[in-house]
Amino acid sequence: MTETAPRIPPPARPPEQEPLPSSVKAREPGPLRQAVAQRIRTLQDDYQRDSSQAVQALALLRRGIGRQATETPELWGLVGMEQFYAAQPENHRPYEAEVLRAERAAHVAVTLWALHQQSNRAKRMHVADGASLGTAVRR
């Protein structure tokens, strides 16, 4: 008598996905992305002009790397969340969890940019319409 292993059917193939709407494909910047990009552009311009305030701001931002945004109140005015809050419609008050997530994302983005920018003052480390982080990592 021979034993045969039970036949396991192959996994079902997922149905073909419908194309994403053009608004999703376009990678339209949301209010958080716009706020962070504007803050970084301002800091970057000032840093390249050797503004003492920008040099100090980048030094402070670098100290925030690896720390939670809630642990670094000295950075709260440097990250650029003010523009994000101003862009929120009056009839939409984001949940506390959404706000915390946005603050954390902005904190990580700006502090890591500050570290990266320090490596080469003459070169702009943040470029508009440049490769996304995922694209850059794949290269």
Kindly give the residue locations of the regions a language model identified.
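The feature captures two recurrent sequence modes
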Residues: 2-93
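Aromatic- and glycine-enriched beta-alpha-beta binding-site module
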Residues: 87-136
